């Protein structure tokens, strides 16, 4: 009973350092507890159209990934931060930008995972996110699905059957209630697995069969 991995938020790691904490000491505490940093939650705006903003975001992502590496982690979430209100973002351009992010990660040893964000107007659907990963043409490309976000974005869970095991490194398991409806549900309405109506067991069995 229990868990073996954690997924800290980069902003919490930053706050820990600002408060005088040492990443070396934190890594030891994590490892002494028998835990592994499986991934981390970052918000670098790698996908945006503005060249200067995107260049700054890649440097931001580099710093974030270096922190993850120093904690013993090998992955970081790469959501469409900065483009959540943009409806017309070119997915081919997004794929090129994801490739640039992957190149940064490959130099550090941390893999950024293209993340589905159901509430966003960009990469809200599983198919869009998979498209960006495939068209990046990078061997480390992968996606980070989430049961709640797949539902919120309007994709069907059967789409996961098209993905092989290596395409998914981590999988977010968030359940959701029957009310409010999908169109108005928000992140704040998420519930623990088993407390909602999501087909959690069915989805996980299908994912496990792909491993």
What are these regions (language model features)?
Residues 16, 43, 81, 184-188:
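Vicinal oxygen chelate
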Residues 12, 45-54, 84, 148, ...:
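The substrate-binding groove and active-site-proximal loops of carbohydrate-active enzymes
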Residues 9, 43, 79, 174:
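Conserved residues at the C-terminal ends of beta-strands
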């Amino acid at each position: 009973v229990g868990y073996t991995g954690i997924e800290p938020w980069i902003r919490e790691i930053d706050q820990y350092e600002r408060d005088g904490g040492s990443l070396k000491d934190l890594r030891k505490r994590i490892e002494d507890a028998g835990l592994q940093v499986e991934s981390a939650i970052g918000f670098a705006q790698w996908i945006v159209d503005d060249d200067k903003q995107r260049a700054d975001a890649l440097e931001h992502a580099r710093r974030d990934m270096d922190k993850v590496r120093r904690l013993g982690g090998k992955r970081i979430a790469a959501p469409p931060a900065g483009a959540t209100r943009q409806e017309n973002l070119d997915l081919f351009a997004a794929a090129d930008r994801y490739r640039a992010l992957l190149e940064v990660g490959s130099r550090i040893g941390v893999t950024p995972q293209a993340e589905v964000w159901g509430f966003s107007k960009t990469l809200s659907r599983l198919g869009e996110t998979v498209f960006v990963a495939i068209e990046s043409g990078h061997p480390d490309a992968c996606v980070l699905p989430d049961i709640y976000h797949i539902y919120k974005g309007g994709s069907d869970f059967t789409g996961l059957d098209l993905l092989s095991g290596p395409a998914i490194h981590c999988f977010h398991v968030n359940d959701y209630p029957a009310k409010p409806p999908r169109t108005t549900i928000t992140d704040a309405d998420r519930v623990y697995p088993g407390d909602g109506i999501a087909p959690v067991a069915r989805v996980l069995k299908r994912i496990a069969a792909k491993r």
